[in-house]
Amino acid sequence: MDVKKLLADVTALPGVSGHEAQVSAYFAEQFRPLVDEVTVDAMYSVIAHKKGNGPKIMLCAHLDEIALMVTHIEDDGSLRLGNVGGVDPRILPASRVWVHGREKLFGTIGALPPHLMSAADRANNYTLDNLHVDIGMSAERAKELVRIGDLVTFDGPARELLNDQFSSKTLDDRSCVAILLRAAEMLQKLVCDADVYFVCSSQEEVGGRGAMTSAFAIDPDLSVVLDVDFAETPTCPPRSALPIDAMIVTHGPFVQPKLNQRLIDCAKKHHVKLNANVASRSTGTDADEIGLSRAGVPSVL
C-alpha cells in the first residue's frame, strides 16, 4: 500500500458532516477486499468486520470533515456562509473554496480590506458575518446554480513536504482512516484472537453521532479511537501542544486506565515512541460517545 498516494486520494474526497455518502462509499470499497464483511449504515459510517476468535474490538476513526454552508445569496452575487463543525473564521480570508451547487463552482473568500476598516474593526477578529464567497457571477446567475444549504468545501490539495511531512485538508481525520486501512491490510492473512471491527465514523465534527450508532450496533468489548491533536509550532504557548515525532496516548476520565496501560506496555515492547496528553474532562472525540454506548465500552484514545 502506497501510504502517500492513499493520503492524497482520501483527503481529496468531499465528506462534510452529514453528507458523507461519497466518501463512505469510497472507503467501503477500499476495505472490501481486506475483511470478511463491510456495511454502510444509515448514518453513512463504514463498518468493516474481520472475523476472529475472541472479544470484539472496535477501531474507530472519523471520515467526515468540517466545512461551510451557503446561508444567503447577496444582490451582488456573493454568498454568505454558516459553518458545519468547528471552522475558525480567522483563517478564512483569501481561502480558495469549492461551492457544491448545481455545478461545482470555484470561489474565494473575501473580506473588507484592512485599509477600509476603522481602528476598532481592525482590532476585532473576522467572523462569518463579515466574510463572503466571491464566485464571479451576477446574483441572477448565482441563484440559478446555487441554493441555500449548498456545501462549501476547502480547496486544499495534497502536498508532500520535506522530511516525510505531508500537508492537505481533511487530515483530521482521514489520516487516521488511512491507518485503519493499513492495519486491515496487515491483518488480512492472519487469524486474529479478536473479532475486529474497523469503523470509519460519520458526523464526529458535529457531536460523534456516527460513532454512537456504530458502537450500539457492534456492542464492542473495547474500543481504540484514532484522532489528531495539536502539533507544536513556534507560536504555541508552553506545554499546550506536542511534537509530531511520536504517537499520543490520552489520559483522563473518559479513557479506561487499565486498557491505557496495556496500550502503553505494548508500545514499549515494540519500541514505539509515545507522548502523553491529558484530557481532564471529555476528550472532544468519538471516544466520548463510544464509552457511553449501551452499558459502557472501555476505550482508549
Where do the language-model regions lie?
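N-terminal hydrophobic/helix-forming segments and targeting peptides
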Residues: 1-301
